[in-house]
Amino acid sequence: MIKTLSKAQKMEREKFRIPRSVQDAIPIRRIFADGIFQVGNQYSKTWSFTDINYAIASKEDKTSMFLDYSELLNALDSGASAKITIYNRRINKAEFERSVLLPDKADGLDEYRHEFNKMLTAQVTGTSNSIVRERYLTVSVVKRNADEARSYFARVGTDLVTHLAQLSSVAQELTLTERLHIFRDFFKAGEQAAAEFNIHEHAKRGQHFKDWFCPDSMEFAADHFKVDARYGRVLYLQDYASYIKDSFVSELCDLDRDLMLSIDILPVPTDEAARQLQSTLLGVETNVANWQRRQNANNNFTATIPYDMELQRKETKEMLDDLTTRDQRMMFGLVTLVHLADSKEQLDSDTETLYSTARKHLCQLSTLRWQQKDGLDTVLPYGLRKIQALRTLTTESTAVLIPFRAQEIMQPNGLYYGQNVVSKNMIVADRRLLLNGNSFRLGVSGSGKSMSAKEEIVQIALSTEDDILILDPESEFGYLTEALGGEVIRISATSDTHINALDMDRAYGDERNPIVSKSEFVLSLFEQLIGDGMVTAKEKSILGRCTEQVYLPYIRNGYKGTPPTLQDFYRLLQMQPEPEAQGLALSSELFITGTLNTFARHTNVDTQARIIAYDIRELGEQLMPLGMLVTLDAIYNRVIRNWKIGKRTWIFMDEIYLLFRYEYSANFLYKLWKRIRKYNGLVTGLTQNVDELLRSDTARLMLANSEFLVMLNQSATDRVELAKLLNISDNQLGYVTNVPAGCGLIRCAGNIVPFTNSFPRNTKLYKLMSTNPSEKKE
């Protein structure tokens, strides 16, 4: 026997004690405040790690991930054993309601909250999408005391986190409470704890730490066990196929039940493994020589070596080559699995399903007869291995049992964005937590952009007190805005709605003197009227002087009363002695006293509403540049005002490509994208003209720097451009190629996840959000 294995078995050997209570059946001897357990003669520590997009990666990316995972396995210390655990647990109902569902507010909008909650609840009442899949890595080592173990885990933990980071998986050391939660969720599924575990409080009260998570009863039979009212069974992988697909573990874990699968790994030092293989090879060669000698003695000089001997020789040589020339390591592996059900019949049915899945991969799962207790202690992430059905593997053959499948986006207190196509789990993201929460929604006409944005607006309006500002060039958001109690400001040359371009309060501008900020705005306004670069230095001086003079009475009155208008500014210009002032007045006459004077009068709409949609569809070509300037100025200063009182602002800009046609609005957007996070705001841009958007270098930069992107069905040319810009693989592009409305890819903080999102049609919210012309007629 290999020295490493015999030493490990000797260290792990314990005296058998008949458990007198449920607590005695839990094999943890001691716990420490930093999450270390003493189990048997060993100390163990657990890390959680996130999933990566392995299933939808391209062949090249899969190979790269496989090699990186192999490096992680090679980095495991041969003085310790490792356990990789995949835990499927059912979503906790109370936790789901607290973090995802919208609470009632008695503000007249609860009807919409109930509709939205009904849709969210329907997403998790099925089977597959009510399961959360978690991943853990537990390292166990024999040390003389906890301090030695602590030093060891500190060193090993750094290596593990680094290697998992190369795979784009985020590893995190589990605290004591987080680690105990794994066992509580397993033994007491769905039962809410009266209080979180606190080691000091438990010690003060004289309670045993096991009381917090152990079940009320545990019964072990020949081929199953019972935990309280639930049934469970531990299986192990008895026979391995010659070639196992990398999807094997993932398919085993697709069972829609509470399930835990563990892969125990005991690495062997390469020199020791090589010596063992050389000894084995020598034995094989000796057997071959003896067989050949016997054949020669019988005058059988043409006999070929028996197949089993030849195969043994070939496999031993190949494994020796793997170790000496291909940087492989020898490892002992063990795969165990426990699944739970509400009845014995369901348990037997699930076991047969798992057997069938294994047979499909030419492997054999078997039930641990009369070893259910030892099996349970092995599969749970205590850090123990009590089942000795070890299989000799290399790094590659261990790496095939890869625990990765599909990335999940499930952030607490986030907004719902659809369902993960691969895992069927909900996608819940919190843009507020991202380094840059700005977002684009890209897709051809009819792909579901507006619907997706409206669904996000509904959630923000119903679940927060944040302000929502919408720039609406296509008149698509009016009905929804009014239904949510907001204000629609329809701006055109012929409408009775007016917005005063010179509106200003004490909070105007960022952190500077409001009059300085307003002077810059007035200068930009006249550059739009006269032409960019056409305003001379003399004219700039006149404009600055007039801005100060026109606001003087208003400022002296403490920013109270009625602010001046462009008509007041026009009269002041006419009173200036310089001929340039008369030229400025004449150039601006059409937009101040003429027919296009929409922005030259006092504001006559509610610009303080919590939700505002600026409908600029009817502005026309002549008034559009000025309209954009005034509207964007109003939006920006609302953001600043909210920031000063500690309020968040969400901005939605439909057909954002239109803003890049005008230099001022393009520059404004770029500055807004860079600075809005500082002012507690988030911007979302929607467009179907991705090609036109990408012609702007500014837009490309904004797109690349946005941490949250929703990509729906794309045209062929747009797909190619986006793939280059955002590094999207061909496999992933398939999710934005000829797909139904509401389907596509979400990129959140660099993670790309395929999603689908359909809202129930028989709801009031759907009718408010739908932009389908045929549905609007209905």
Name every feature range the model reports, one short phrase each.
Residues K449:
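Conserved lysine of the Walker
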Residues M1-F404:
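Extended, folded cores of ATP/NTP-driven motor/assembly subunits in large transport
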Residues I52, K59-S78, R89, C253, ...:
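P-loop NTPase motor domains
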Residues R441:
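Hydrophobic anchor at the beta1->P-loop junction of P-loop NTPases
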Residues G485-I489, T698-M711:
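A short helix-turn-beta junction within AAA+ P-loop NTPase domains corresponding to the substrate/partner-engaging
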